[in-house]
């Protein structure tokens, strides 16, 4: 096994951070720890509660054979701000590229409060690499800060923003559709997003808010990728978390679930909001591997390949080839 690299090289990303934010005082005290011990990578923000890669296999009954093993990496709820600095986002991008996904899906809330955050975070995300490209939808914070400005910034980085639209993916002679909708309450139009997709065609929907899963299930969507909930962000022992007002948000807080024949994965996200704290709810980078489902309905729950909730985790267990 070749040598492993610390993520990111400190001088390189510190220079980027200083370029966009100046030399921060508070940010220096909130910087994440980087260490490499015994062939394992630790990437843990002491306030953010750690970062893990969740590798999970998803069985889809309508997935064509040509997309067997297709890997989707999901990044959600980045919330770039003073408390989620650019060097942390850059580290996540570099880690994501090491996982060599077929598609990167960005499920919204790139920024928290400031329009000045849009261009810098978009430039960092422009470094994402995937065989089938990078697709994105916008979240509620993105619409509050400036949806058009963010969409333009992402497009300049060759990131396709699916605003009530869809895209056709082709692989080994097979078709797979990826649709995306604007956020719930900000113009989400599922009918427009899937218009033109053949009936019964395998379709993956990107929707920032899991409240849209019921509508997706009614329309036969195969898989929904969402975020928004942060997994609760702070998880109290015994009490758990109380998040959201809708039945969908209360039920679909994090991880894999299903509603009828429609499966959903809700990412805990990589950032924080309101307070720079995660407790008993580490940030995550989901890596979802799709497989054609050829079993009976009772066995349709996904097979867990590996969960990496808490750093350190071994890069070799995730199939990451070192340089």
Residues covered by each model-derived region:
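Acidic, histidine-bearing metal-coordination/catalytic regions of metal-dependent phosphoesterases
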Residues: 1-71, 82, 316-323
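Acidic/histidine-rich helix-loop elements
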Residues: 40-48, 75-88, 111-116, 142-146, ...
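Beta-strand-turn-beta hairpins that frame and shape the catalytic cleft
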Residues: 51, 60-73, 159-160, 167-179, ...
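Active-site neighborhood of phospho(di)ester-bond hydrolases with catalytic His/Asp-centered motifs
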Residues: 73-76, 103-109, 133-140, 162-165, ...
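Core catalytic region of metal-dependent phosphoesterases/phosphodiesterases
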Residues: 81-170
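Solvent-exposed loop/turn segments at secondary-structure junctions
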Residues: 110-112, 140-144, 167-169, 183-186, ...
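Binuclear metal-dependent hydrolase catalytic cores centered on His/Asp/Glu-rich metal-binding motifs
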Residues: 152, 156-159, 163-165, 171-207, ...
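Conserved beta-sheet core of the metallophosphoesterase superfamily
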Residues: 210-289, 294-296
């Amino acid at each position: 096994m070749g040598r492993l690299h610390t993520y990111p090289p400190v001088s390189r990303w510190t220079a980027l951070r200083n370029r966009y934010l100046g030399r921060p005082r508070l940010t220096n005290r909130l910087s994440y720890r980087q260490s490499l011990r015994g062939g394992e990578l630790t990437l843990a923000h002491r306030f953010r509660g750690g970062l893990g890669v969740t590798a999970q296999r998803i069985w889809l009954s309508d997935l064509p054979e040509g997309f067997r093993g297709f890997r989707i990496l999901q990044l959600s709820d980045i919330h770039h701000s003073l408390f989620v600095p650019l060097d942390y986002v850059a580290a996540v991008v570099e880690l994501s590229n090491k996982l060599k996904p077929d598609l990167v899906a960005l499920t919204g809330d790139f920024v928290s409060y400031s329009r000045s955050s849009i261009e810098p975070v978009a430039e960092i995300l422009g470094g994402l690499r995937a065989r089938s490209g990078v697709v994105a939808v916008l979240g509620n914070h993105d619409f509050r800060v400036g949806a058009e400005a963010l969409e333009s910034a992402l497009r300049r980085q060759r990131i396709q923003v699916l605003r009530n639209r869809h895209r056709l993916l082709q692989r080994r002679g097979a078709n797979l559709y990826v649709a995306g909708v604007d956020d719930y309450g900000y113009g989400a139009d599922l009918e427009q997003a899937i218009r033109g997709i053949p009936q019964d065609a395998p379709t993956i929907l990107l929707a920032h808010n899991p409240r849209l899963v019921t509508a997706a299930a009614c329309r036969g969507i195969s898989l929904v990728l969402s975020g928004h909930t942060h997994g609760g962000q702070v998880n109290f022992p015994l009490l758990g978390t109380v998040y959201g007002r809708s039945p969908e948000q209360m039920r679909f807080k994090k991880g894999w679930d299903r509603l009828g024949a429609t499966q959903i994965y809700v990412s805990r996200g990589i950032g924080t909001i309101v307070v720079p704290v995660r407790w008993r709810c580490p940030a995550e980078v989901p890596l979802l591997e799709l497989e054609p489902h050829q079993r009976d309905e009772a066995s349709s729950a996904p097979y867990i390949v590996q969960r990496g909730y808490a750093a350190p985790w071994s890069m070799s267990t995730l199939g990451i080839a070192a340089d």
